[in-house]
Amino acid sequence: MKLIRGIHNLKKINSNSAVSIGNFDGVHLGHQKLLSNLYKIGKKNNILTVLILFEPQPLEFLNNKNSPKRLTTIQNKIKYIQSWKIDIILCIKFNESFSSLSAEKFIKNILITKLNIKFIIIGDDFRFGSKRNGNISLLKEIGYQYNFKVIEISSLLYKNKIKISSTNIRKCLLENKIELARKLLGRPFSISGRVIHGNKIGRKLGYPTANISLRKNIPLNNGVYAVKISCFFNKKFVGICNIGIKPSYFSSKKHRLLEVHLFNFNLNLYEEKIEVFLYKKIRNECFFSSKNKLKEQISKDIEIVKKYFNLI
C-alpha cells in the first residue's frame, strides 16, 4: 500500500483505477463493505484501487468547535484500512482552498485527470464538493460523459433497524452502549497511545496501572471498563481501566487520563505503544474519601470484569 499525503504529491496515474471516497471514521462494518467492493472491483478488472481520505475531516475544518468527536485517529484509520490491500491511500488536506473546490472540478481535475478513474464506489448518502453540492446523480452524469462507472453501495442496517454509521456509533458510546458499538464497528472500540509515567498511586494500592494521556475529542464517558490491550507484537491481555480525572481522595490531576490494570501481568510498558479495546462499561467514575474505600471498590470492579471474561 502506498500513502500519498496531499494533492501536490499526487502524480498522474497512467493505469486505470477504482476509487472510493470518504472520512471512514471508525472503519466500521459499512466502511468495510465499501472497502471489500473496492478491492473486488480492482482485482476483477486488474486495475489500481485508490481510497481518498481527508485530514482534517471536513467538519473539523468547517465547524471546528462543534465537529463530531473522532472514533479513530488518522494513524489507526490507515492501520485498519491496510488489511484490505488497497493500492493507494490519498490523504487530502482539507483546507480553505479544497473546501471551495466545486464538485465538477473535483471530478475532472482529480478523479479523471490525475487518477484515470474507471469505477467509483460510494455509499448511498455520499455528498461532495463545495457546499456539498455534488451527489450521486452528478457523478453518474459526468461518468457517462467520461466513461467511468458509479457503483452505489447501500447502507448496512444492524438487525434491520439501526443504520451502521459513525454518527450512530458515537451515539452508542456516549449512551454507554459499548457492546452495541462493538457490533456496529465489527470490533471493540479502541484507544491507542504511548504509556506515560504516572504518580504510581495504583501500584501503592496493589493495582499497578499503565497510563495513557487522552486526546480531548474521544466520544466516551468517564468510568470503569472491562478491556483487553494489545502490545508486544499484538499479543492481547485482559484488564480493567478507568477513564477520567481519577476523582479520589488524593487526586490533583485536571487532564483526562486512561489508566489500565492488567491481570497476571508484570512486564514494563513504559514508553510502549498500546491499544486498549473496550468491551463493557462497569460503572461511572466515583469520588472516594479514603484509600481503603477506593481499594475495596477496585477489588469489586475486578471481580465483575473477571466474571465478564469468564476468568472466574
Swiss-Prot record:
Q: Record the organism.
A: Buchnera aphidicola subsp. Schizaphis graminum (strain Sg)
Q: Which InterPro entries match?
A: FAD_synthase, Riboflavin_kinase, Riboflavin_kinase_bac, Riboflavin_kinase_bac/euk, Riboflavin_kinase_dom_sf, Rossmann-like_a/b/a_fold
Q: Does the keyword Ribonucleoprotein apply?
A: no
Query: Which Gene Ontology terms cover its molecular function?
Result: ATP binding; FMN adenylyltransferase activity; riboflavin kinase activity
UniProt KW keywords:
ATP-binding, FAD, Flavoprotein, FMN, Kinase, Multifunctional enzyme, Nucleotide-binding, Nucleotidyltransferase, Transferase
What SUPFAM superfamilies does the database record attribute to this sequence? Nucleotidylyl transferase (SSF52374), Riboflavin kinase-like (SSF82114)
Q: Which family does this protein fall into?
A: Belongs to the RibF family.
**What's the stated role of this polypeptide?**
Catalyzes the phosphorylation of riboflavin to FMN followed by the adenylation of FMN to FAD.
Q: What is its EC number?
A: 2.7.1.26, 2.7.7.2
Q: Which GO terms describe its biological process?
A: FAD biosynthetic process; FMN biosynthetic process; riboflavin biosynthetic process
- Annotated pathway: Cofactor biosynthesis; FAD biosynthesis; FAD from FMN: step 1/1; Cofactor biosynthesis; FMN biosynthesis; FMN from riboflavin (ATP route): step 1/1
Source domain of life is: Bacteria
What protein is this chain from? Bifunctional riboflavin kinase/FMN adenylyltransferase
Catalytic activity from the UniProt record: riboflavin + ATP = FMN + ADP + H(+); FMN + ATP + H(+) = FAD + diphosphate
